[in-house]
Amino acid sequence: MDLFDRLKELREQGLAEIKEAESEKSLNDVRVKLVGKKGELTQILHQMKDVAPEKRREVGQKVNELRDLFNENLASAKDNLIEKAIEARLEAEKIDVTLPGRRKHVGSKHPIRIIQDDLERFFIGMGYQVVQGPEIESEHYNFEMLNLPKDHPARDMQATFYVDADHLLRSQTSPVQARTMEKHDFDKGDLKMISPGKVYRRDDDDATHSHQFMQMEGLVVGKNISLSDLKGTLELVAKHEFGQDRETRLRPSYFPFTEPSVEMDVSCFECGGKGCAICKNTGWIEVLGAGIVHPNVLSAAGIDPSVYSGFAFGLGLDRFAILKYGIDDIRDFYSDDVRFLQQFRQEED
């Protein structure tokens, strides 16, 4: 069999094998067999030395034409196989649109976040600004600027989380107030601010205590700010959060950064002030601490206490949420039980 006959036979055989290939792998095997470096066409070219000189050009031309034909059919066959594979995958992954859908569970706000957002809107409406500050604080701002001397019990290692000798996890958001007082320009008006955020204390976690909790503190500094201004503000807060029929009272207390200092109670939600287990038969429930800003605190911030005065208050957002929603265990706030959070969906905006 001469080379021309061999080329004719190879043409028919090769095209048939290309057509019969059922996968990209088998098609590639055919390609290697026909046009690879050691394939059939290459073997024919190696036999050119045995061809008469006058026919070598014609044989070479036939080989090139056949190689082009094979490559063209190989490319077309590969495209067809890819298309079939895509169609098969689409068929296998086809979605039955008549099947019922899966319900998406919509998230809800955390109860503490609900309380915080509500109070922020309330105070912003009264002209307050919301100010944030660092959670890792220096002793200077966390204690000294707030009239807490070196020997104060709150500065003890057993009560506070120290990061190093001079820095700690803030034990209240009051340092934000100290930083803000230092920078405030009273020529532009009184300072009215709230500072919400996380605070940290060395408490053993139980149903009513947590080593980390949420606090919101408020501060007003200006000329002729009085205890009656504080009383009126706190009454508005209590009625806003706990109901317009809620009665309030102020009791004398002690805080190093205020003088005089008071604690505010509200009439019991359960018994209306008659006395029950919730209010320990007193008819009242403690909700926050407050007072007139101590002159030493004003002086530390560079404010003349003979010209300016102010009031401050601090409330636990966790405690407000516990009281408002009747939650028994503070640890529920920090659990990962979605069912607990879903109870408060109706309380959202």
UniProtKB/Swiss-Prot annotation:
One GO MF term attached to the UniProt entry: transferase activity
Keywords, in A-Z order: Aminoacyl-tRNA synthetase, ATP-binding, Cytoplasm, Ligase, Magnesium, Metal-binding, Nucleotide-binding, Protein biosynthesis
This enzyme's EC code(s): 6.1.1.20
Family per record: Belongs to the class-II aminoacyl-tRNA synthetase family. Phe-tRNA synthetase alpha subunit type 1 subfamily.
Designated name of the protein: Phenylalanine--tRNA ligase alpha subunit
Catalytic activity: tRNA(Phe) + L-phenylalanine + ATP = L-phenylalanyl-tRNA(Phe) + AMP + diphosphate + H(+)
UniProt xrefs under InterPro entries: aa-tRNA-synth_II, aa-tRNA-synth_II/BPL/LPL, Phe-tRNA-synth_IIc_asu, Phe-tRNA_ligase_II_N, Phe_tRNA_ligase_alpha1_bac, Phenylalanyl-tRNA_Synthase, tRNA-bd_arm
CDD domains xrefs: PheRS_alpha_core
Cofactor note: Binds 2 magnesium ions per tetramer.
Quaternary data: Tetramer of two alpha and two beta subunits.
Recorded superkingdom: Bacteria
Chief site of localization: cytoplasm
Location(s) in or outside the cell: Cytoplasm
Cofactors, names only: Mg(2+)
Disulfide feature: none
Pfam family, one: Phe_tRNA-synt_N
Positions of Mg(2+) binding: E259
Protein's gene: pheS
Species of origin: Lactobacillus delbrueckii subsp. bulgaricus (strain ATCC 11842 / DSM 20081 / BCRC 10696 / JCM 1002 / NBRC 13953 / NCIMB 11778 / NCTC 12712 / WDCM 00102 / Lb 14)
GO biological process: phenylalanyl-tRNA aminoacylation
Stretches of the chain forming a coiled coil according to its record: none
GO cellular component terms attached to this protein's record: cytoplasm
Lineage of origin: Bacteria, Bacillati, Bacillota, Bacilli, Lactobacillales
